[in-house]
Amino acid sequence: PELAKFQQAQMLIQARWMITFVFFEKELYENPDQDLNTLWWKIVSEVQLVTPPENRNQPDWAAKIHFTLAPVYYQNYLLGELMAAQLLRHIETTISPDFFTKEAGELLIEQFFKPGALYNWNEKIRRVTGEKLNPAYFVELNCKSSK
């Protein structure tokens, strides 16, 4: 139970981090001439609820290597977590509550991996689980209370 609580907390913190990146990049590309450090700390404080250090005026946003080496990518991490939660719930409800079964592996291989890039990610998750990407499964997995 303690590990599950830790994993839930870790994922929720990571989700806020990912959302911070996505919001910042959107604003950065819409107006690259603005004060990006002020923008960075504005978004960090709104999304992550972290107070910026006093009297700090350094380009903290630029310390994130993704902005230069893998721009407009961070949302993919969150999409992956959303898809994983939906696949997990689908397997638990249609195959077995135990994810690590031969049948679950076969479903993933045959229906998810073998089609490769034949379908875009949104169509693929719909074909495999029967519904479009639904964040409710991520919320259920990461926001439920563990007793």
PLM features: residue spans?
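C-terminal, non-catalytic "cap/extension" segments appended to globular domains
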Residues: 2-147
